[in-house]
């Protein structure tokens, strides 16, 4: 992405929700590289899909020659951002937050280049400046620059104040001051001139712009990316099992890949603009090709491949594709032990059984059939496969020959009802 028209290119992709003084920012970008930052609060032990758009936006700026600062909120994570939250957040211990800070910093690192010369990325932690600050310094040096009148009129806070069942604590109310000071601090330390974040961060970003101007007399800017919505109105980034995480131990690469494969036609081309680095011309050509092919669209596979590779690397992508292909064609011999571990983690329903269980009981225990009688009928009708092979004997007892890596057996009833058996060791 050329730096001179970067904002326009981001707008073409639908990646700009709001921007402060767009003309002045475009001029500043045209003059040469700037430093910019995005903050990630450790509210869990992993980032999720909602963090991916701003994180990739940092990467887009770095590719255009700018210097990204990834700020992990070791201090703000102890407080909790009230923005558009219906209720007060639960406070976590310092040890927990520090553990999450370390995990999130490691998660962010592969997306940015920390060794590429002048625009090498920087990792920062706001605990470095807040950890030793006393309350008097906070109130005198930061608090005096904030108007309570303006703070309570910010939309993110106003929504909480207007609820009869929920107020807002002074702790969460002060979050706005902390994030505002982050911007001023990073401006002084690293010359940061732009903050990016989700559109729910607009109030916090504008507070930081005002504070930086008051403390350092510098003009700085803010840009928000849209909160992603789906065409059908349902929440993006959620499955029946909850959030889709970037940590492979919380959401396996296979499950992650399948999430993107299942993207609706109405969303897929928009998501290619948000979550990949494909050129707009490529995306438009793919949309045209899909429209005229008369076949199932290819876009979902392109999207799944691109984003899984970005987040989980080539190895994670290959595993996800291998599992997908093996389940589709019924040939499980290509699967590795770690592939089965992914399936056991979250790839499909899983049940632990004692060795020596017969097939009818396994179908009942796995909830593929409601009773042994129904299980018998399904088996006799050739409707059940064991590891991809039809098993016609209702009295069949599952044995060691049916176990992959001495541990796993895959049952299927009909075409789409799966269950993975994990055999108990004793």
UniProtKB/Swiss-Prot annotation:
One of its GO terms (biological process) is tyrosyl-tRNA aminoacylation. This is Tyrosine--tRNA ligase. Its EC number is 6.1.1.1. GO terms for cellular component: cytosol. It is found in: Cytoplasm. Keywords: Aminoacyl-tRNA synthetase, ATP-binding, Cytoplasm, Ligase, Nucleotide-binding, Protein biosynthesis, RNA-binding. The keyword Cytoplasm applies. Homodimer. Belongs to the class-I aminoacyl-tRNA synthetase family. TyrS type 1 subfamily. NCBIfam families: tyrS. PANTHER family: TYROSINE--TRNA LIGASE, MITOCHONDRIAL (PTHR11766:SF0), TYROSYL-TRNA SYNTHETASE (PTHR11766). The gene is tyrS. InterPro entries: aa-tRNA-synth_I_CS, aa-tRNA-synth_Ic, Rossmann-like_a/b/a_fold, S4_RNA-bd, S4_RNA-bd_sf, SYY-like_C, Tyr-tRNA-ligase, Tyr-tRNA-ligase_bac-type. The keyword Magnesium does not apply. A motif ('HIGH' region) lies at residues 42-51. Coiled coil: none annotated. A motif ('KMSKS' region) lies at residues 235-239. Catalyzes the attachment of tyrosine to tRNA(Tyr) in a two-step reaction: tyrosine is first activated by ATP to form Tyr-AMP and then transferred to the acceptor end of tRNA(Tyr). It catalyses: tRNA(Tyr) + L-tyrosine + ATP = L-tyrosyl-tRNA(Tyr) + AMP + diphosphate + H(+). L-tyrosine binds at residues 37, 175, 179. Residues 357-415 form the S4 RNA-binding domain. GO terms for molecular function: ATP binding; RNA binding; tyrosine-tRNA ligase activity.
């Amino acid at each position: 992405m050329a730096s001179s028209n970067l904002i326009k290119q981001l707008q073409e992709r639908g990646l700009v929700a709001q921007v402060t003084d767009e003309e002045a920012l475009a001029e500043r970008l045209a003059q040469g590289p700037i430093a910019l930052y995005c903050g990630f609060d450790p509210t869990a032990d992993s980032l999720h899909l909602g963090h991916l758009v701003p994180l990739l936006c940092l990467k887009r700026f770095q590719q255009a020659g700018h210097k990204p600062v990834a700020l992990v909120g070791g201090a703000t994570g102890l407080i909790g951002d009230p923005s558009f939250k219906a209720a007060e957040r639960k406070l976590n211990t310092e040890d927990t937050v520090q553990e999450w800070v370390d995990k999130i910093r490691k998660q962010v690192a592969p997306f940015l280049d920390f060794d590429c010369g002048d625009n090498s990325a920087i990792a920062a932690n706001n605990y470095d400046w807040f950890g030793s600050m006393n309350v008097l310094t906070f109130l005198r040096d930061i608090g005096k620059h904030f108007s309570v009148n303006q703070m309570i009129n910010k939309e993110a806070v106003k929504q909480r104040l207007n609820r009869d069942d929920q107020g807002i604590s002074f702790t969460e109310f002060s979050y706005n001051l902390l994030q505002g000071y982050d911007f001023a601090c990073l401006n002084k330390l690293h010359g940061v001139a732009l903050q990016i974040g989700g559109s729910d961060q607009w109030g916090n970003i504008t507070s930081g712009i005002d504070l930086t101007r008051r403390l350092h007399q510098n003009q700085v800017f803010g840009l928000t990316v849209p909160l992603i919505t789906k065409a059908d109105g349902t929440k993006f980034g959620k499955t029946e099992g909850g959030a889709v995480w970037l940590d492979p131990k919380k959401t396996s690469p296979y499950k992650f890949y399948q999430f993107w494969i299942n993207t609706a036609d109405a969303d897929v081309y928009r998501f290619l603009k948000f979550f990949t680095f494909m050129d707009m011309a490529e995306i438009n050509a793919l949309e045209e090709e899909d429209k005229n092919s008369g076949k199932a669209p290819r876009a979902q596979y392109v999207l799944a491949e691109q984003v899984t590779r970005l987040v989980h690397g080539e190895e994670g992508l290959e595993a996800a594709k291998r599992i997908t292909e093996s389940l589709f064609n019924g040939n499980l011999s290509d699967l590795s032990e770690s592939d089965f571990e992914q399936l056991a983690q979250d790839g499909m329903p899983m049940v632990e059984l004692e060795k020596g269980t017969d097939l009818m009981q396994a179908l009942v225990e796995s909830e593929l059939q409601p009773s042994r009688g129904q299980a018998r009928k399904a088996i006799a009708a050739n409707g059940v496969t064991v590891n991809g092979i039809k098993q016609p004997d209702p009295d069949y007892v599952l044995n060691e020959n049916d176990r992959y890596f001495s541990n796993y057996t895959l049952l299927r009833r009909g075409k789409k009802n799966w269950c993975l058996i994990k055999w108990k060791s004793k």
